[in-house]
């Protein structure tokens, strides 16, 4: 977040180079983006909603997404993943998101990997505290004072419809 040069080099320039290489070899690219590309003011964001990142990480991911979108043989996954176990001592009670652990994310990814376009993948829409409390009983409540937008959760309608095909 604070090292802008590194964010640009890794997320934007690196992804642009990867897209060019995939284009030369006609290889599909699967790009992992983030729910942080959405503004976080209204929640329930669909894949075709306007994007407006609220931090440098989101901006760097959106920059990378732009290159990937130019290459039609691609899948962009906008995800809201977190570590397992939940490692933080505190969790926000006033920030709603779609946290999903990596292992659950992979199960979904394997089912949608052949699709193209943009897909949101995440877990149930709930506060970070509600999510954390299920896995870490002693997690403390905390109010966000603007560290995160309050409504960064995504619509999972598209991915759920795709999963019904399996």
Regions found by a protein language model. Name each.
Residues 1-10, 21-23:
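NAD(P)H-binding glycine-rich loop region in Rossmannoid oxidoreductase-like domains
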Residues 8, 12, 49-62, 95-103, ...:
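Short-chain dehydrogenase/reductase
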Residues 16-52:
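Conserved Rossmann-fold NAD(P)-dependent oxidoreductase catalytic core, especially the SDR/UDP-sugar
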Residues 29-33, 75-78, 98, 120:
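Structural signature of the Rossmann-like NAD(P)-dependent dehydrogenase/reductase core
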Residues 52-80:
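Active-site Tyr-X1-5-Lys
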Residues 79-114:
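Substrate-positioning beta->alpha
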Residues 108-154:
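Mid/C-terminal beta-alpha module of Rossmann-like enzyme folds, strongest
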